[in-house]
Amino acid sequence: MLTAIQALELTSPAAGEFRGESVLVGDGRPVFGGQLMGQVLMAAAASHGDKVVRSLQIMFPRAGDVARPLEVSVDTLHSGRTMATVGVAVRQGQRHISQATVLLDTEEEDVIRHAPPLPAVGDPEQAKPAENLSHHGAEVRIVGNVDLGDPEQVGPPEVAVWVRWPDAPRGDRARNHAISAWYTDNMLIGAAMRPHAGVGGSMAHASLSTGVVTHTLTFHEASDAADWHLLTNDAAYAGRGRVYGTGRSSRRTGLSCRPSARTR
């Protein structure tokens, strides 16, 4: 079985065209959105090797099937000296399962700098290992006595987890960005369910249909996914069959690396 990091290895039969495979997440067959984001980021980075990925906006109009290969197409909308914008489509045959716009740019020196401090949640060594969330090569520890799968455990619409990928290749910015996208897609629905007794993550893809609709992700800094990062999620709104929230990924030093916003 592929690991998440192995799934980032795309083949390229022609310029702007890539092929990939999927990993199985949970008991269902839909392709996981975090995996698709990583593969989209890898394809975009490979198409403009002189630049780094800065932001991603992605939609998931249809569910993919993990048993079928993925076809990833990159269309360069603009390429300049310091910035490039690409559209990235993911298909399985005639089925269009994802569409993204990716901004790439070059590194610049600081003009001004500030970032929010790391939330006071304790060190990762103090957090509880989350075996049910640690899959495909990741290590995840959840802050507090939180069980996102338990329909009867009620709490605020937020969750914080420490995440690291021990086998992530240090110094490989494209791959570290891509694998870091994985868990930005994984926690918000569970956070949104927490205030509501009788609803929990264990119901997903069984008695309750869940899935990502849109996701926006920005990379502020280079970072190594092999190091611990704190991922915080705040589900600000739930209603009309949708959830909206934001998240932030920060190093242990407090440097914000990746904010994201998602709609389900």
What are these regions (language model features)?
Residues 1-264:
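Terminal targeting signals and extreme-terminal segments of soluble enzymes
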